[in-house]
């Protein structure tokens, strides 16, 4: 269950569409955009190109939130074995990135992923149910679930766009 009552209400409204791997380049460009005027980003053009290549190979994935046909939020990351490593997210409308994250979490659970690494503890991610774990426990999770020999693949575009109950 999601920890935020207002997000559950938003998810049930269904005034949005969620897609997987539909427009990865647009998501990474949006994530790379500075959050404030004159701001900088770690997602340089070279980093973007590398992730786009990893997407084409089936390792990097995006989750996109659309409203009225417009991309308004999303996130991207890497899947290795049954572990997903979130890299960055963006939102152009209230709750748009949270909608993408909630659908990602449900998709990963439905596909037996065991690890969703958000990389940093933030108030935003904690509000979505994220929690920090000790380094040793994280290493054990990776040993058990980040199998390097799994076959990468594109995710089904409509794989996360199911009604929220």
Question: Where in this protein do the model-derived segments appear?
Answer:
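N-acyltransferase acceptor-side catalytic subdomain
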Residues: 1-165
């Amino acid at each position: 269950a999601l920890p935020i009552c207002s997000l559950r209400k938003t998810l049930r409204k269904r005034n949005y569409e969620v897609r997987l791997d539909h427009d990865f380049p647009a998501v990474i460009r949006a994530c790379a955009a500075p959050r404030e005027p004159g701001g900088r980003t770690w997602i340089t053009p070279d980093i973007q190109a590398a992730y786009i290549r990893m997407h084409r190979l089936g390792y990097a994935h995006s989750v996109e939130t659309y409203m009225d046909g417009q991309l308004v939020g999303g996130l991207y990351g890497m899947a290795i074995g049954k572990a997903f490593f979130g890299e960055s997210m963006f939102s152009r409308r209230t709750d748009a990135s949270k909608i993408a994250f909630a659908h990602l979490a449900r998709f990963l659970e439905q596909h037996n992923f065991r690890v969703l690494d958000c990389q940093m503890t933030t108030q935003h991610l904690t509000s979505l149910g994220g929690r920090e774990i000790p380094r040793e426990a994280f290493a054990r999770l990776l040993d058990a679930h980040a199998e390097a020999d799994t076959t990468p693949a594109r995710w089904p575009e409509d794989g996360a766009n199911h009604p929220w109950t």
